[in-house]
UniProtKB/Swiss-Prot annotation:
It comes from Paracoccidioides brasiliensis (strain Pb18). Residues 1-19 form a transit peptide. Residues 49-144, 209-305 are annotated as: Disordered. Residues 20-149 are mitochondrial matrix. The chain crosses the membrane at residues 150-169. Residues 170-685 are mitochondrial intermembrane. This is MICOS complex subunit MIC60. PANTHER family: MICOS COMPLEX SUBUNIT MIC60, MITOFILIN. Pfam families: Mitofilin. The keyword ATP-binding does not apply. It is found in: Mitochondrion inner membrane. Belongs to the MICOS complex subunit Mic60 family.
Length: 685
């Protein structure tokens, strides 16, 4: 920005406001290019020449404003080569709407006048016009942020889809299996939500599960009490054996031998860790323990009074026992209450003995009430059962009576229907018998009538034959001669009709033979292929009812009788031309290139032509044999020889083989037609 302001100030002080007219019109063409090459752009857009306007006079500012308006429609001047950073003043172009005469001339500032002496001959420099302001830089292209939007939408869509999948997994088991198997961390998310839902629905469930179970207290290590310690009524020698209290015995249990419950727990001493024995247990243990050998027990001289133990015996609360084995609900309630008693006995039995006793009484009352309710319910149920049995018995009796009545009615009805059906069947059979008898009488009468008619006819025939014999005998057999004459005339008529058919068949056969000869003559006498559609149509018309002739004509290719077939001489001449080309390509492989064609052409020049009937499957031998067959007139064998060629030789002779096939097809069809005509003549004879 500093360099631009300095260059602008220099341009204002050095260049005139209105340049010369000649320079304007001469440099107008190059002004646009110079302006585009020297124009500078900055990121921060500021008002051009703002600092300069503040320091210049108001007249200079006005001039700069006018020049700025004029520069919007004009091009800039090409910069001087001596200073590329200084912009040239604006020069009006031919298309400018502001004329140079309308530009205001800025007055000379006092500072410039003071610098020039009054007597100097040099004219004072004119104040320079304000340079054209640089056009505002184009606004920067707004950032589209497509990648940011795409990532944001993708993240939101993925999150919504994942949340929807978790939500739907809680509703559908099938989708739960799919989501937990394929979605990452899907199973953890679903399990977490299920746990949260469970905690919200059952807030007290976790508290019960988190309660620590009462674990048995650690009894510590085994403690051995010396033999001389403790109180005993026996002598000291008897304490040698069994001084270890870790062995099994009654002393291992610190509670009474109350066998009513199985869940009683021992209460241990918190600091000493050694269980104390009650006097009764000690006496019982001493009585059950056998005396060691060699030591004789002596009766105590003075009976010692039992002393109270240092630690008072622990009192326990008796368990609740109710005789309700057949009530599982009551038994479960008693079991739960006994468990509570066991826990209380282990902790502080004396504190809760009163409430427990009261609870026992209430539970006993509840048990008795339940038993009473059960007995009442059983009694009412038994009464209802008895009433139901009575009603069922009554209903069964009524039902049985009703069934018996219905059975009797059905039996009566069935008997009546049976009698009516029996009468109807007997009547129908009687009618059938009467009908059969009547028909038998009619048949017998008709048979007798027919026999009488036959006898009458036979008598009439005998009478006629007798009359005929008598007439013949009287007229000397004239009637028999007339009969013979009639039969002879009929035979002559039959023979005449048969010979007329023979004559017609012979005439058609001759006409067919003439038509076939016309076709053959047309084919043999034509030097060039000529159509023979009319001749073939005449043959088909004469043998319209003969299937063999029609099949032979249909076997001829339409191309053959529409375009004609070549003659034998034409085929021989064409064969010789084809044979020349085939010999040139006789040495070519199937996938031959230009080199192979050239080599085959050169080698063909030095090959010797075979004569006679050479043996072999090479191209030259095959061509020689085919040529011999053509000279003999055997087109069939020549075509067979040419058809045995392979590769380029067969490809080159393909057209010649097609012509030969058409010729052979036509000749074969004509031979079949001639044979059929001869066969007709033989059949007539």
């Amino acid at each position: 920005m500093l360099r631009t302001s300095i260059a602008t100030s220099r341009q204002l002080l050095s260049s005139p406001v209105c340049p010369k007219a000649s320079a304007q019109w001469l440099r107008s063409s190059n002004a646009g290019r110079a302006n585009t090459t020297t124009r500078r752009y900055y990121a921060i857009q500021q008002e051009p020449n703002g600092a300069l306007r503040s320091s210049l006079s108001p007249s200079a500012a006005a001039v700069s404003d006018v020049s700025q308006r004029a520069s919007n429609s004009t091009n800039t001047k090409r910069p001087n080569t001596s200073d590329l950073n200084v912009r040239s003043p604006a020069s009006p172009s031919t298309g400018s709407t502001l004329k140079p005469e309308t530009v205001l001339v800025a007055p000379v500032s006092p500072l410039r006048q003071g610098q020039s002496s009054p007597g100097s001959a040099a004219p004072a420099p004119e104040p320079a016009a304000a340079p054209p302001p640089s056009p505002p830089p184009p606004p920067p292209a707004p950032k589209t942020g497509r990648l940011r939007k795409f990532l944001l939408y993708l993240f939101l869509t993925t999150g919504l889809a994942y949340a929807g999948g978790v939500w739907y997994s809680l509703r559908s088991d099938n989708f739960y299996d799919f989501f937990t198997e394929y979605a990452p961390y899907g199973e953890n998310a679903v399990i977490y939500l299920e746990e949260r839902d469970f905690r919200n629905r059952f807030p007290n469930a976790t508290k019960k599960n988190n309660r620590r179970a009462v674990a048995p207290r650690d009894e510590g290590a085994q403690v051995t009490i010396p033999g001389g310690s403790g109180l005993s009524w026996k002598v000291a020698e008897e304490q040698q054996e069994g001084s270890d209290i870790s062995k099994k015995g009654p002393h291992m249990s610190a509670v009474d031998n109350n066998k009513a419950t199985k869940d009683t727990k021992t209460v241990e001493k918190t600091k000493g860790g050694v269980t104390s024995k009650s006097p009764a247990q000690k006496e019982e243990a001493v009585k059950t323990k056998p005396a060691p050998e060699g030591v004789k027990t002596q009766p105590a001289k003075v009976a010692e009074t039992p002393r109270e133990p240092a630690i008072p015996a622990i009192t326990t609360i008796d368990h609740l026992v109710l005789n309700t084995e057949d009530e599982p609900v009551v038994q479960d309630l008693v079991k739960v209450f006994n468990d509570i008693i066991t826990v209380i006995s282990a902790d502080a039995p004396s504190s809760f003995s009163g409430p427990v006793a009261k609870a026992k009484e209430e539970l006993e009352k509840i048990g008795k009430r339940i038993l009473a309710l059960k007995s009442d319910a059983q009694a009412s149920a038994q009464k209802e059962i008895n009433d139901a049995h009575a009603s069922f018995d009554k209903s069964a009796a009524n039902l049985i009576r009703h069934i018996d009545e219905m059975r009797a009615e059905d039996a009566t009805k069935f008997r009546e229907e049976f009698e009516a059906e029996r009468e109807r069947i007997a009547q129908s059979y009687q009618e059938k018998i009467n009908t059969e008898l009547q028909r038998a009488h009619e048949v017998a009468e008709q048979r007798l009538r027919n026999e009488l008619v036959e006898q009458a006819i036979e008598l009439n025939r005998k009478f006629l034959s007798d009359v005929k014999n008598l007439v013949e005998h009287e007229r000397e057999s004239r009637l028999s001669k007339l009969a013979e004459l009639v039969s002879s005339v009929a035979e002559l008529e039959r023979l005449t009709a048969g010979w007329s058919n023979v004559i017609d068949i012979n005439l058609k056969t001759q006409q067919l033979q003439v038509a076939v000869d016309a076709v053959r003559t047309t084919l043999e006498n034509s030097n060039v292929p000529r159509p023979f559609i009319r001749e073939l149509a005449a043959v088909k018309e004469l043998a319209s009812n003969d299937e063999v002739v029609s099949a032979a004509i249909d076997s001829i290719s339409p191309v053959a009788y529409q375009r004609g077939i070549p003659s034998s001489a034409h085929l021989v001449d064409r064969f010789r031309r084809v044979a020349t080309e085939v010999r040139k390509a006789s040495l070519l492989p199937e996938n031959a290139g230009i080199t192979s064609h050239a080599a085959s052409f050169v080698l063909n020049k030095v090959m010797l032509k075979k004569h006679g009937s050479p043996a072999g499957n090479d191209v030259e031998s095959t061509l020689t044999r085919a040529e011999n067959f053509l000279e003999e007139g055997n087109l069939d064998e020549a075509a067979r020889e040419m058809n045995s060629l392979k590769g380029w030789a067969k490809l080159l002779s393909k057209d010649w083989l097609a012509d030969v096939r058409r010729v052979l097809e036509v000749k074969q069809a004509l031979e079949v037609i001639e044979t059929e005509a001869r066969l007709r003549c033989l059949q007539v004879e």
